[in-house]
């Protein structure tokens, strides 16, 4: 069962990315990605 997850920037809280996951997990996904508003690579966390 795959689910759609939305990633938001940890600094400015803008929702920049959406990813699909293979299975449901209890832990939040954290990935370092590029943020357009911050103009740099920042930590992005999964929103709920």
UniProtKB/Swiss-Prot annotation:
Database matches in Pfam families: Ribosomal_L33
Cellular component aspect of the GO annotation: cytoplasm; ribonucleoprotein complex; ribosome
Keyword hit for Ribosomal protein: yes
Gene3D superfamilies from the UniProt entry: Ribosomal protein L33
InterPro entries given in the database record: Ribosomal_bL33, Ribosomal_bL33_sf, Ribosomal_zn-bd
Similarity comment: family membership: Belongs to the bacterial ribosomal protein bL33 family.
NCBIfam families from the UniProt entry: PRK00504.1, rpmG_bact
Protein name: Large ribosomal subunit protein bL33A
